[in-house]
Amino acid sequence: YELGYDILKPKGTLTYITSNKWMRAAYGESLRNFFAEKTNPDILIDFSGNQIFDTATVDTNILMFSKEENKQETHACVVKEKLLINLGDYFRQNSTKTKFINKDSWVILSEIEQRIKAKVEAVGTPLKDWDINIYRGVLTGYNEAFIIDGKKKDELIAEDPKSAEIIRPILRGRDIKKYSYEFADLWLINSHNGIKENGVKPINIDDYPAIKKHLNLFYPQLEKRADKGDTPYNLRNCAYMDDFSKQKIIYPNMTKFLPFVFDEKGLLTNQKCFIITGKHVEYLTAFFNSSLFKY
């Protein structure tokens, strides 16, 4: 987008068909801010989950912007029909004028929906102002070594019962369902790097000879990885490791309709999940899984 913007003449226009993830995802904040501050977004068409383009493997959108000041009057629509005879006619009949003025999620709403949204925001409390924390799952840098199946877990514990102290169940993004999860019998060797703020020392792998023997099979890869701890045997720093032991909400990072599950068993998650800790997490789980939240 920025490269195209750079070669535009003043008031020149650019139209792209791309993935629509930038419209709402956190990683799209800087791009949304760029559009709002540097361009005039004239037309935005979100195809949502409808596969209009045969060669596209992702949900798509069309954005047309001009190289001029944002007039704060974007003609936008969401395509809700799977089969379109004439996109131009559909756009003229269903588009609405919307202001996109900052990095907040770009959500296309009808005039009635915009009024409802404004009314809710006027009396409600934004999620960011609730007493919660949101964290990413555990990054190992080399899952093949640190994430093991149940058979390997049993072997390590049989060889050295002390191994059980740092082996914990782990969920992946694909395991998360609405109000539940499908445990794939995967386990994390949690050789964490300590939590300095809490006075927790890093795991000394020499205290766990069976696990060290297992990890030594992958030592060249462990040594090369960028996100390691004090030693190649340790995971990278994770200041919120204790939060995985608290009551929390787990949800995957890449699905169209996010499922949420409440956990109080101390499950760990991989990098394909996020967790939410804090107050009212049971209530929030129910709300996040509701049709009201999806609306």
Question: Across the structure, where does each feature detected by a protein language model lie?
Answer:
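Alpha-helix boundary recognition
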Residues: 35-36, 172, 216, 288-289
